[in-house]
Each structure stands twice: as C-alpha cells, then as structure tokens.
Amino acid sequence: MGLDIVNWKAIVEALLYAAGDEGLTKKQLLTVLEIEEPELNTIMADVADEYRGDTRGIELIEYADTYMLSTKKDFAPYLKKLIEVPSKGLSQASLEVLAIVSYKQPITRAEIEEIRGVKSERILHSLVAKALLCEVGRADGPGRAILYGTTPTFLEQFGLKTLDELPPLPENAEEDVLQEEADLFFENFNQTFEDIK
C-alpha cells in the first residue's frame, strides 16, 4: 500500500467529505488512490469500524458500490432542532440556487454549477439542512448524481401553494446563454421573495 492504514483512512475521509452527499464510487476511489480492490476493501472496512463507535456522529454508508459519509440516525432529533433554529435571511447565492432548482427540478449539482458558473455544494448542503431542498432521485449515467428538488417547506416559506405559482419565465428563456439564464432565474425569484417579505 505504501502509506500506513491510518494515512489511507485519513485520505479516504477527506475524499468522501469533499464528495459530499453524492459520495464516491469504488471505481473512483481505486482510480484516485491508485490501489487494488482488496486494499480498498480493507481500508473501507477499517473506516466503517471506526465510525461505528459511540463517540462518532457520522457513519460510512455503502450502496450500489458507492460510499458516502452520513450523520447517524441517532442524532436526528438534534439535527431537526438545528433546522428549526431561526437563522438569518437567505443570501443572494442561496436565493439564486433556489430559483434555479425551483424552475429546473429535478436537477443535479453539476447542472446548477454549470448555470451559475461557480461551485454550489455548500449552498446546496445549507438549503437541504434548512429543508428547502431535498434529494428527489438519482440521475442516470456514471456516478448516479443526486437530483435535487424543492420541498413543502420551500413552498410554505415562500408563500406558495404549488410551483405553478412561480412567476412564468419568458418563452425564449431556454435559448439564452447560461449566464443570462441564471440572471433571469434570480431576478424572477428575487421578485417573488421581495413580494412576500
């Protein structure tokens, strides 16, 4: 393996943290780490064992040859309280992501980032934690990226009964360049937000 098991576990932890809620496939880990499958299996088993302890708040989840870090279900009541704690208003970037998701759902993080032109992972995590967005499925294709959509809480917070009440987009919105499309989403959505404040 080259490195000792402690170093490998730390590297895997960093990779899974950076991958966020999309996780990493076994193939991706093998490619990045440049090791053989038996070695990876040993490392992942050790990582999983370490997270099983009572002193850890996260656990390693494996599904369909994909690994991801997740909070333990035992701590759900505390996470729920965190979501319910009043927080400051949404940033412009958060409103922009909400606008894109609300009009284009279901949509992947990569598609959101393509429209915005910047990374959006932290904003997505924050909006999911606030229960404004949620996972609505998985995209077809390599990696099976998470598809995001809005939640009933989103509708409630923005004074909407259904998504049909969102301001309509101009018919030529699909023909605009990506940056103009992002600006249009934000402009329309921000107006709705201002109207209900």
UniProtKB/Swiss-Prot annotation:
Alphabetized InterPro entries for the sequence: ScpB_csome_segregation, WH-like_DNA-bd_sf, WH_DNA-bd_sf
A biological-process GO annotation: cell division
Gene3D superfamilies: Winged helix-like DNA-binding domain superfamily/Winged helix DNA-binding domain (1.10.10.10)
GO cellular component, as recorded: cytoplasm
Keywords, sorted A to Z: Cell cycle, Cell division, Chromosome partition, Cytoplasm
Main location: cytoplasm
Signal sequence extent: none
Intracellular or extracellular location(s): Cytoplasm
Parts of the chain that traverse the membrane: none
Entries under Pfam families matching the protein: SMC_ScpB (PF04079)
Protein's job: Participates in chromosomal partition during cell division. May act via the formation of a condensin-like complex containing Smc and ScpA that pull DNA away from mid-cell into both cell halves.
NCBIfam families from the UniProt entry: SMC-Scp complex subunit ScpB (TIGR00281)
Subunit composition and interactions: Homodimer. Homodimerization may be required to stabilize the binding of ScpA to the Smc head domains. Component of a cohesin-like complex composed of ScpA, ScpB and the Smc homodimer, in which ScpA and ScpB bind to the head domain of Smc. The presence of the three proteins is required for the association of the complex with DNA.
Family indicated by similarity: Belongs to the ScpB family.
Protein name listed in UniProt: Segregation and condensation protein B
Gene designation: scpB
